[in-house]
Amino acid sequence: MNFIFITLFENLIRPYFDDSILGRALKNEKIKIYFFNPRDFTANKYKKVDSYMIGGGAGLLINTEPLAETIKAVLENFNEVRFIFPTPAAKKFTQNDAKRLSKYKNLCFICGRYEGIDERIVEKYVNEVFCLGDFILTGGELAAMCFTDAIARNIKGVLGNEKSLDEESFENLLLEAPEFTKPDIFENLSINSEFLKGNHNKIQVLKNQMANSKTRFFRPDMFRKVIAKKGKK
């Protein structure tokens, strides 16, 4: 898969792909990354890309024309591009979105700065808008990296053990159960003895119980969906 970033700050994003799982995926060509900078498509010698908002208001927007030219350059270089705009004025990105988007060939993230981008760019070019959470960031780069990470790990061959995807949070509407490692007793806190007996069926039952309890406590909204789903059976 190709991940394309329209950004004024390539150096904020590129180091994230230097190491760990995404670094290995990039090296093995499971994913590729590309960058397009609106400053390269400006008509002024100062490479200025900010513009005042029509109608007034605090802050600036990325100028519409260089941004549109940047998008057109992406379309000239890639086929069937799906454009995504990270913005707090949208629905929250979910694990289901990550799975669905992992099936596409070319994803392009338009990383806003200042107060964002002209809404007409969104209407004409953007396929999907997503929010990272109920808070404001200084730019779209961090959200785009989070979305990319979540999407990439659903691509075949990116994770070393793909079965681990089946046991993560949000699968089956539950948060992931707590996990433990050595030592058996840590600072007077012990692991449930069932984990130490090696009976995998009983361990799975225990994990399911713990996942239900964790979901009920931290995400009652999700737990209500679990109850509703069970009621339909």
Curated annotation (Swiss-Prot):
Keywords: Cytoplasm, Methyltransferase, S-adenosyl-L-methionine, Transferase, tRNA processing. GO terms for molecular function: tRNA (guanine(37)-N1)-methyltransferase activity. Its EC number is 2.1.1.228. Its main location: cytoplasm. Homodimer. Specifically methylates guanosine-37 in various tRNAs. This is tRNA (guanine-N(1)-)-methyltransferase. It comes from Campylobacter hominis (strain ATCC BAA-381 / DSM 21671 / CCUG 45161 / LMG 19568 / NCTC 13146 / CH001A).
